[in-house]
From Swiss-Prot:
Claim: Transcription regulation is one of the keywords in the record: no
Sites carrying sugar chains: 110, 219
Deleted gene: phenotype: Cells form a higher number of smaller aggregates.
Cysteines joined through disulfide linkages: 26-103, 29-97, 56-68
Species per Swiss-Prot/TrEMBL record: Dictyostelium discoideum (Social amoeba)
Domain Saposin B-type: 22-107
Protein name as catalogued: Countin-2
Signal peptide (UniProt feature, chain positions): 1-19
Similarity comment text for this entry: Belongs to the countin family.
Keyword Phosphoprotein: no
PROSITE patterns linked: SAP_B (PS50015)
Subcellular location(s) per record: Secreted
Gene Ontology annotations of biological process type: aggregation involved in sorocarp development; cell-cell adhesion
Length: 254
């Protein structure tokens, strides 16, 4: 009887270790889908789908082929094709990677953005503004995002960024984004008050399959100077009292 219980315990621990290793691929999967979704859809729609190798070998380089083969081998070619054939118009990288079983999901997750601040509160063109955010996870997040949206004084131009958070346990966390004013001919960067929205989501914020828990707002002021554009970059600080992983990869969404 004792041997039976020990065997069950070993199998249970092994399953947890396997899940942790598999979920460690989540950021890699999300990056891969963000970068190679278009190529994959073209390959799959072309009907060359006899095996993982047949599909993945048609991607442009060895790194992309390796990531594709790894993800495809986990679920098998039939399930891999099924996921991509069911995407429709909502190509949500987090949802795709959850369907490929490398990103965890939790329908009972819950989290709250607590506070946000911008430093400095105002500055001339050329200033880098740091947007800080503190958030609390009440119930474990599967795969989600902390996202920011900055809207210029005209209300017509937005800059978006998000940081991926994976298997985040209950606790308090903080992270930050940078809004850097850099010269560009593509878009005007007018002086005035910029509105900042920060949100936390299960899934990709704004996507069909996601849940946005809450949002908080802040602002900063750009004073007169040369016309430039804003760039959003994520910092992967992700400090907190709980546990989980945070990716500093920035996905420009708007």
């Amino acid at each position: 009887m004792m041997i039976k219980y020990i065997t069950i315990a070993i199998l249970f621990i092994a399953s947890l270790v396997k899940a942790d290793l598999q979920f460690s691929l989540c950021p890699t999967c999300v990056d891969f889908i963000n970068n190679d979704m278009g190529d994959l859809e073209k390959i799959i729609s072309g009907g060359i789908a006899t095996s993982c190798g047949a599909v993945c070998s048609l991607l442009p380089n060895n790194i992309e082929q390796g990531a594709c083969n790894l993800l495809c081998d986990i679920v098998g070619i039939d399930e891999f094709l099924k996921v991509f054939n069911n995407i429709g118009e909502d190509a949500d990288p987090v949802w795709i990677c959850e369907e490929l079983t490398v990103c965890p999901k939790n329908q009972n997750s819950n989290a709250t953005v607590l506070t946000s601040d911008v430093s400095p509160a105002s500055g001339p063109h050329g200033t880098t503004f740091t947007i800080g955010v503190a958030y609390k996870v009440e119930s474990t997040l599967g795969t989600g995002e902390v996202a920011v949206m900055v809207t210029d004084p005209t209300g017509s131009n937005g800059f978006g960024d998000a940081q991926l958070i994976v298997n985040t346990q209950p606790g308090q966390y903080s992270t930050s984004f940078s809004f850097a004013a850099t010269p560009s001919e593509d878009e005007q960067f007018p002086a005035g008050v910029y509105q900042v929205q920060l949100m936390i989501c299960e899934g990709s914020c704004g996507a069909k399959h996601s849940v946005t828990f809450n949002s908080v707002y802040a602002n900063f002021t750009v004073t007169s100077g040369p016309s430039v554009t804003g760039q959003m970059t994520g910092t992967g600080s992700g400090s907190g009292s709980g546990s989980g992983s945070s990716s500093g990869a920035a996905y420009l969404r708007y």
